[in-house]
Amino acid sequence: MRGFRIVIAGHGTLPAALLATTELICGEIPDLAAVGLSASESPDHYAEGLRATIGRDHRPVLVLCDLLGGTPFNVASAIGRRSPRVVCIAGANLAMAVEAALADGDLDDALVERLIEVGRAGIVETERHRARRVS
C-alpha cells in the first residue's frame, strides 16, 4: 500500500492529462490529484490552490512537476522547503507518474531515486535505442 499522496503540478492542462492517462493505464488511483496553472492565473493564486490540494493532513506528498524553474515547480518547492513531508521532482513524465502510482511503501530517498531513474530511462531516441538493442 502506498503511504503517500501524489500531486501532479504543471502548466495548463498537462497535469490533468497526465493524471487521466496514469489512471487509464493503472485504473483509478486514490490520493492522486492534478493542479494546472492557467495562462491568466497569478503565481499567488496558483500557490493557494496547490497548498489547498497538498493539504494539511500530515501525510507525505510527492509533487511531480512538469518543468524545472517553472511557476508550478517554484511554488511547490517553496511549499516543500517549509514542509519536510512534501517532496518535489521536476521533469515529470508518464513513466514516473505510473511508477509512483503503483509504488508500495513510503516516500523515501530510494523511491525518489527510482522515479528519477524510470523517468530518464524512458527518454530515448528510437534509432539509437534500436541500434543498442541489436548490437
Located regions from the model:
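N-terminal loops that bind phosphate or other acidic moieties
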Residues: 1-135
